[in-house]
């Protein structure tokens, strides 16, 4: 329910857009005449898109903190992120071309997206995250996979017959970075708190989220290293131990696409610069 165009529509009054404002209060607030909070056949979840409030990074963090706080004010309410592709204009220092137009098959856009996913999970506390769109014919940063005719980087909008019968398939690093989350973090898993994270400073360094599968005693840690230096961490589990003190890394970088590596010790987990790494292990 909701499908808000951006997170701020969920928690505040939008100038000149009363019909889009304060959607959490409207649908689930105790004082709302339109509240559906007590309808047993409606899932107690509000949804919104991750667009627009992603740059500068300080706004990305602040908006996620605000929507998380608002969701927590309604007992039992959860938040889904239901649509995102690159549409902002952060400049060429962040992504090739500086904005959404102009597809990017490389790691810069992949890290841009992975940062948003990580912060949506860790800061906004979303319980579901979706991308727009799977396959794109356009010269735009909207596809996990792109198709083209070999002569250009994509069609002009409206050309429905572009690559209709033949063409080339191009995978993106965004596809693989997305897989660092989606291949390993599954429904029913529980997110594990990582204490003492400064989300703002982490956003240009290393962002961490962790999850556990209680039934199978499985542990997953996803690290997004936005920085230019290798970072090393020691994994300490509160109330448990890492089986055999080891985890298997899966790395997406400029030279790797979800590449499985050799087992690493839990007391020396290394995250290469400009990479997304998923560590998978078991716990006792």
Regions found by a protein language model. Give the residues of each.
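Aromatic/acidic polysaccharide-binding cleft in carbohydrate-active enzymes
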Residues: 78-183, 192-201
